[in-house]
């Protein structure tokens, strides 16, 4: 499905929206059933290079105690999530786009997939990144 069709579907109203929601529920129940899946949130760093005024971890906020979890701490948390049947984890940090940071996250993703036999889903929330990243 292309982007234009998705946008059109999301903009539906009235009976068409009702039918869309009904169909989406049918697909969801067929694919994953009527279940709840746990997702672990791993806030591994609050270091950020941006200065967004709305954000509590913005670069200029000197009242924040900064932290950056070790790779072992992150991998241990992911292993815990996998051992306890979490469907996925979110790796979240402030926005950093340096090459060492990108390399670190790339290595973590590979190790998480390895330790979970490629079973643990991963969502990244590390701010805006370049298309190539």
Put a short name on every predicted segment.
Residues 59-74, 81-133:
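Core AdoMet radical
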Residues 2-7, 17-18, 54-56, 85-90, ...:
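Generic detector of short, locally flexible boundary/turn motifs and exposed helical patches
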Residues 5, 53, 80, 131-132:
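Non-transmembrane, interaction-prone segments in cytosolic or luminal domains
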Residues 1-51:
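Flexible, acidic/Gly-rich N-terminal and inter-domain linker regions that tether
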Residues 5-6, 21-33, 55-65, 118, ...:
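Short charge-dense sequence patches
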Residues 30-84:
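Active-site cofactor/substrate anionic-group-binding motifs, chiefly glycine-
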């Amino acid at each position: 499905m292309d982007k234009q069709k998705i946008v059109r579907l999301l903009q539906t109203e009235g009976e068409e929206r009702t039918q869309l929601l009904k169909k989406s529920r049918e697909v969801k129940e067929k694919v994953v059933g009527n279940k709840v899946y746990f997702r672990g949130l791993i806030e591994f760093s609050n270091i950020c290079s941006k200065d967004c005024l709305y954000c509590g971890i913005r670069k200029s906020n000197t009242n924040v105690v900064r932290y950056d979890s070790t790779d072992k701490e992150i991998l241990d948390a992911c292993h815990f999530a996998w051992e306890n049947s979490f469907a996925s984890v979110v790796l979240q940090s402030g926005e950093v786009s340096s090459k060492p940071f990108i390399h670190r996250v790339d290595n973590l993703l590979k190790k998480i997939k390895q330790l979970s036999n490629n079973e643990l889903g991963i969502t990244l929330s590390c701010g805006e990144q370049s298309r190539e990243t």
